[in-house]
Amino acid sequence: MSDYKDTLNLPKTSFSMKGNLANKEPMILNKWEKQGIYKKIREHFAGREKFVLHDGPPYANGSIHVGHAVNKILKDIIVKSKTLSGYDAPYIPTWDCHGLPIELQVEKKHGKAGQKISEDAFRKECRKYAKQQVEIQKKDFKRLGVLGQWDQPYLTMDFSYEANMIRTLAKIIENKHLTKGFKPVHWCTDCGSALAEAEVEYKDKISPAIDVKFKIKDKEKLAKAFGLESLNHDAFAIIWTTTPWTLPANQAIAVNNQLNYSLVKIEDFYIILAENLVEQTLKRYAIENAQVIANTSGYKLIGIIAEHPFYSRHVPILHGDHVTDDSGTGMVHTAPTHGVEDFTLGKEHDLSMEIFVKGNGCYSENTKLFAGEFVFKANDRVIELLGEKKRLMNFDKLKHSYPHCWRHKTPLIFRATPQWFISMEKEGLREKAIEAIKETSWAPSWGQARIEGMIKDRPDWCISRQRTWGVPLPLFIHKETEELHPNTIEILHKVAQKIEKGGIEAWFNADDNEFIAETDKYKRVKDTLDVWFDSGSSSMCILDIDKSLSYPADLYLEGSDQHRGWFQTSLLVAMSAKGNQPYKEVFTHGFVVDEHGRKMSKSLGNVTSPQDIYNTLGADILRLWTASTDYKSEMAVSDQILKRTADTYRRLRNTARFLLSNLEGFNPETDIIEFDKLVKLDQWAIAKTKEFQDKIIEAYDKYQTHTVAQLIHHFCSIEMGSFYLDIIKDRQYTAKADGHPRKSAQTAIYHIVHALVRWMAPILSYTADEIWEATPKTTDLPIQLCEWYTDLKSFNDQDELNLEFWAKIQEIRSEVNRILEIKRNEEVIKASLEAEIIIYADNDNYKLLEKLGNELRFLLISSKASLRAIEEKTNNSIESNITGLNIEVNKIEEPKCERCWHRSATVGQNEEYQDICSRCVENITTEAGESREFA
């Protein structure tokens, strides 16, 4: 027996079977950095149509988590796909660098600003800390394979950014959107500052729920309101509240003049309740022997005076539109400095706006009975006092959704303070923002209704904060009238110039007379800007200024929580400063959860860190998981899910390796065969690749990365692995190395690889780079500078052996394989090359299959295949799942060719080559080798 190994075209490639990504990827990343690959992309695509994905800044505090990784990877995939489509698609990362979380970290080390450390030194430490955090996060983002302008990102603490925020504020003031107000705002007693809507999160809280008796001072007036001559017992208005601590600030009781109210007798006193709530309220009180004495309309109660339950204070009954008879008692406790509706009612009726609660959450010195106590701790004292005064009608506990600080996770209070607001009404900002939302494309589509509803319902945006590490609100107000300085716009531009040179410290360290002359009449505002104003200004501070970008951005892509965060603040800043929206399209992705749909938390032990993933499996596995998941809803990840992703990756890598290994010896400059001269199956492979490429590009354009991933996987495992590559192995390995059949297949493989590597590049960025290095090519460009492959061809209308034809062949082949498997299990054959396959076909199937002539056997990977009319079917044939098709499989008794392993009667016919078939002899001894037309 001779050794024919040297006569075979054995596969060979530098592209390894094992990914070994955790070790290889850092080397590839290092190569990109040495090449300056991002800069080369910018130079190569300069002058092309722009596509700008604007980066929402992550907060510069702590290591990145898998949610950060998902966000950056999705952005990177989209930007890279747009580059492949020929766009100039820059990506400039940004970071959010001011605010409380950084202050808290610095406080841990240095103490509070103004106590153990000066405010100036504190700011320097904050800046230093933020810079360190940016570098930590940047390293992780780069390791994920994300390309961008990492050497010059935008930081909200850059002097130029801080200065441009002040200029943006100037435009907002110029457009008359800024107002000063004394209003109740969400207040965090731990932060000692007001919070914006985006900084508030709602969690369940158990609160005391009490019904309080307010004694009616004028019983005669009350009797008259109910159509009675007199009342022989005391009467009480009953309010229900879950915030007993606000009772010291009570100034009124609100009723609705459109509701009906009942006077109810209980033993020796009367209570007033909304008529529709009498039954359920008495049931709540467990009172059975009460009697409704009379009913009246709410408007008749207006103006009646009650007495505060523990202060000598008259409390009027007033009308409030917000009062309903859905729950409670239909009479609402009104503390103007602790609620939005209460405040509005207080302003309407000139109620006292005395502040009883300080910024630290403790009652002020002028709060009788409770001075110095923390409000939530005072709840018990208030309830106890009400009991002593016999003013507590009922006491329960209620579990309800309550606002909490996003950072401290502690309950907030509503507290009226003087603050600066962007008014939603003053210049029609609300309506303009809603119109802009309608002009923007939102995906998923429910995002539009969500943000629209939020804008419709949101209060004025409180943009002032009482913090140390933040961009100042550099205003001067009159010491007596508190009006803004008449030259405010000019002053702000002067401040911006100073900040551009010396950062925010230049404002805090400057004297007032550096900005204004009338320091005796005007005082500076000491507040800082809400950090959401920082990130919300990015369209004005980056897109509107950086000439390498464009305004508005083509795309904003963030997590679904940003409808109430960055999407909204960006819109409000842009609309109030510039008058149009900052984005054309807004996409959101879901949150990352574990495989059971639970939020990730250290306490549950279900945290999957991106660092662990890329240090073990590789960043490309994380990228593939991200792309494969439909990110419009929650994205589940776990070790098991990532293991499945790694299995998918292996299949893709193996396909790429098989393709590359069969391009050994192929020179694209001399060996490419024209499409119409290719073996028909190779024509199909190219046309099928073209069909998939069209779908893949369409999916990329729609940002449907999961569809892209599915298409690539299907292409590799089904169209290639289970069909085309399986069939061409024989031709690739055994045909003459430079003969037409092999060069035809290599031409198809060359085109397939060039298309496939580009499809993969946005998702499997490291692997695509590795594939590209091992690919024969006619260009020196790195894969990152390439565009979609354009040398693919489709069948024309005259081609009989078109995609439809081959789809039917694939269907028939699947049935043949099914029956071959049956015969393997029955031990009739061990391998398909031992089989003789006879297909009995009806007229339509016969006409289809006879087009392949004697090459049908190559498609079926058998040594012998024949076609007969269905009428000739034998009892040995098996009916297939295709109508009009029976299949018979018999074992071939002919000898095995030691070179191609086919069974053939021609083995031994050549005296020089006794153990191989005539086809192999032809491939070894003749100049042209065998010929193929179809397969």
From Swiss-Prot:
GO cellular component: cytosol
Role, per record: Catalyzes the attachment of isoleucine to tRNA(Ile). As IleRS can inadvertently accommodate and process structurally similar amino acids such as valine, to avoid such errors it has two additional distinct tRNA(Ile)-dependent editing activities. One activity is designated as 'pretransfer' editing and involves the hydrolysis of activated Val-AMP. The other activity is designated 'posttransfer' editing and involves deacylation of mischarged Val-tRNA(Ile).
One of the protein's GO biological processes: isoleucyl-tRNA aminoacylation
Localisation per UniProt entry: Cytoplasm
Any Pfam family hit: Anticodon_1
Binding site for ATP: K602
PANTHER family for the chain: ISOLEUCINE--TRNA LIGASE, MITOCHONDRIAL, SOLEUCYL-TRNA SYNTHETASE
Domain notes: IleRS has two distinct active sites: one for aminoacylation and one for editing. The misactivated valine is translocated from the active site to the editing site, which sterically excludes the correctly activated isoleucine. The single editing site contains two valyl binding pockets, one specific for each substrate (Val-AMP or Val-tRNA(Ile)).
Motif 'KMSKS' region in this chain: 599-603
UniProt KW keywords: Aminoacyl-tRNA synthetase, ATP-binding, Cytoplasm, Ligase, Metal-binding, Nucleotide-binding, Protein biosynthesis, Zinc
EC number(s) per entry: 6.1.1.5
Keyword Aminoacyl-tRNA synthetase: yes
PROSITE patterns per UniProt: AA_TRNA_LIGASE_I
Motif ('HIGH' region): 58-68
Protein's UniProt name: Isoleucine--tRNA ligase
Catalytic reaction annotation: tRNA(Ile) + L-isoleucine + ATP = L-isoleucyl-tRNA(Ile) + AMP + diphosphate
Subunit-level organization: Monomer.
InterPro entries per UniProt: aa-tRNA-synth_I_CS (IPR001412), aa-tRNA-synth_Ia (IPR002300), Anticodon_Ile_BEm (IPR033708), Ile-tRNA-ligase (IPR002301), Ile-tRNA-ligase_type1 (IPR023585), Ile-tRNA_ligase (IPR050081), M/V/L/I-tRNA-synth_anticd-bd (IPR013155), Rossmann-like_a/b/a_fold (IPR014729)
Homology family: Belongs to the class-I aminoacyl-tRNA synthetase family. IleS type 1 subfamily.
Names of required cofactors: Zn(2+)
Residue numbers binding L-isoleucyl-5'-AMP: E558
EC class name: ligase
Positions that bind Zn(2+): C897, C900, C917, C920
Keyword Cytoplasm: yes
